[in-house]
Amino acid sequence: MTRSSIPSIALIVIVLVTLVWVSRDRLMPGASREHASEKPATAVSGGATSAMFTSRAIGDPPKGEERPQIAHVAIVDLDRDGLNDVLVCDSLRNVVTWIRQATRGTFTESVIAGVSAPAHVEAIDFDKDGDLDLVVAALGFLFPNNNRVGSVIVLENDGQQKFRSHYIADRIARVADARAADLDGDGDLDVSVAGFGYDDGETSWLENKGGWKFEQHVLQQLSGPINAIPVDINGDTFLDVVALVSQEWEEIWAFINDGKGNLTPRMLWGSTNPDFGSSWMTMVDMDKDGDPDIVYANGDAFEYAPPNSRPWQGVQWLENRGDLKFELHRMIDQQGVTSPEAVDLDGNGDLDVLLVNANNDWDNPAAPSLLWLENDGKMQFTMHPIASSPTHLLTLAVGDLDGDGKPDAVTGGMHISRPYDRIGCITGWFTRR
């Protein structure tokens, strides 16, 4: 959602240049460039499943006329008391918050730290002292901006859930994603970084030099990285980085690690459509064959005023065929979708997909904001709308909130466009089955 809500002259020029550029052969070996519409969607439309969840607002409600701008949520037991909590990146109030579940079903929100336009938060024991620290990606400014106002912050936990801020990278391209992993094999945690920027961006990693000192290594200078996920994509035991690059590129890249922090770029997939609208990616073994696949949504429409979806938007999964070759399977044609999460929602042993909608026809009261793609066990999917309120849902996390062993969910609303009649900040969705 970091893309412009009003098309700029610069963006129009970039798109025109891109239309010429895509006719050239710039594919890496093993990569493919295609339009997802060339692959028919495997999902069919099923009935509504609102009875699957009960929902309620958790955390602090909006104040007065506030319109929430929640960029990311995560489910984690931060204080390790056996009850899952919720972490929130609130880009309206410029804070990272903790919605603590102190007793079962009772949620209380408190501010952890002030951060300028936080976009992603990850809980991990970064300093290996036995408690959970937080790695935060910060845009610096929510809306499009070419200034280098991005940062990566580690919030160090003192063991009592009091946090000290360490800015391990500052004044870099607006950061949409940052995740911890040992990328150079020296035993400490480094950080992969998606520097979205605007016209200028970069995918990079931050080498941990000790003493809270980090060195940035730029892997690729393309605008629009949304995700930078550490994962062993080729099965050689070394963590690579897989990046989703949006803007006019609309590509998925792998940076292959030799185990010592030397990462080589390799395109895994690219669209022929420079307006494809990449919105989010997650890595999961979707077909349970032992290697990581990619579940990938293209529902971004924030560059239009008002946000206006396109017919080619939807969700697909890229099947890992080995040797860095991926086969695209279109799952669903659906406008505005983002934040797909693979989860066995119906308990039948295969992975379904839960996802949200940030840009739909909200004047239609039935337009879904939360959807379930039901897997029939043969990788054919049936789409079920779950809810149509709140609207403008940008972020989704899955986990067991009520301790019944079944997957629940949390969503966050990004209400930067009309209508404003079904506003929600943080919503908990509790499985009934």
Language-model regions, residue ranges each:
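Beta-propeller-forming repeat regions
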Residues: 4-433
